[in-house]
């Protein structure tokens, strides 16, 4: 299970370039994107690394079996909302103790559509992979895509949008990706 994953490295490089353009087209601000790395780890270990509350998006991975997670840092959600509504990126919102509002959820859905489209483009020529939105959660116990002991492949991307530092984490069960 351990070792380099050259296919995922290529996909992540492409996705980092693609998401920069996709986010610019969405918010008209050019984010800085850097790749945080690829890890193969237990699902429980991945969940422990995520600061809650956060935005867990469960997606179907077509044509593979099973689901994956697209985890958007709340700072990313608020940076996108701020940019969409003409803000300068100076105001920082806190999510603790509340759910996302209907407006915030709509923006999250648009953000996820952008992420899914750019991620599918990153797989072109390698494998015809698509992410299809299922639902969003705020707590990890409701975002089960694998058993706690199951191995997952995680990729993290660090973004700078204005004064905001934020991240996107992608988490896939290892077994469906292994043949690719």
Q: Which residue stretches match the model-derived regions?
A:
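N-terminal auxiliary interaction/assembly segments of multi-subunit proteins
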Residues: 1-180
């Amino acid at each position: 299970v351990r070792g380099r994953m050259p296919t995922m490295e290529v996909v992540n490089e492409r996705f980092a370039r693609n998401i920069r353009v996709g986010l610019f087209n969405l918010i008209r601000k050019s984010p800085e994107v850097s790749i945080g790395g690829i890890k193969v780890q237990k699902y429980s270990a991945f969940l422990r690394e995520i600061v809650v509350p956060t935005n867990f998006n469960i997606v179907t991975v077509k044509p593979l079996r099973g689901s994956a997670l697209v985890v958007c840092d709340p700072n990313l959600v608020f940076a996108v909302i701020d940019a969409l509504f003409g803000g300068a990126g100076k105001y920082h919102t806190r999510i603790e103790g509340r759910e996302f509002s209907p407006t915030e959820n709509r923006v999250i859905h648009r953000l996820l559509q952008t992420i899914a489209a750019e991620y599918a483009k990153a797989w072109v020529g390698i494998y015809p992979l698509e992410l299809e939105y299922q639902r969003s959660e705020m707590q990890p116990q409701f975002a089960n895509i694998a058993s706690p002991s199951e191995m997952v492949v995680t990729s993290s991307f660090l973004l700078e949008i204005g004064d905001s530092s934020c991240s996107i984490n992608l988490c896939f069960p290892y077994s469906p990706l292994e043949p690719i």
